[in-house]
Amino acid sequence: MSSTFSFDVVSKLDMQEFDNALNQAKKELQQRYDLKNTNSSIEFNQKDMQLTLESADEFSLKSVVDIIESKMIKRGISIKSLDFGKVEPASQKSVRQKISLKEGIDKENAKKITNAVKDMKLKVQASVQGEEVRISGKSKDELQTVMSALKEMDLPVPLQFTNYR
């Protein structure tokens, strides 16, 4: 019986954990003494998957970004899923920064993953399926080797492995 095994390489954001991290960041923002009179705020547009940060100056905006990053790391969310926009001036001498959330593996990174799998010279196949990459092969050991190699790759998107069969 020659059965094949496979797994999917995906880049998904756990929205529940992200929401928890965001709520913790908002709570800390209200309690921090150094950010008291800076009118700093964090707003999340769920439809556009975009964070909007506002603060009195760039220094306090950097502190808000640090708060968000630390809360995300504590909740186990990779900060690679954040795409930082430029810091732009807003009303009344304040500054604003938009941060987009990235989900899914784009074609360029999917191609890098498939090429890396082919360069390993293992008996596995990689195929791009929309925003995920399916790796299949006859040996579970080879699939685990591919998994560990992909974890060590430095890609601009966080990777998760699902549908291991």
From Swiss-Prot:
Keywords: Nucleotide-binding. It comes from the Bacteria. CDD domains: YajQ_like. GO terms for cellular component: cytosol. One of its GO terms (molecular function) is nucleotide binding. NCBIfam families: PRK05412.1. HAMAP family: YajQ. Belongs to the YajQ family. Nucleotide-binding protein. This is Nucleotide-binding protein Ctha_0558.
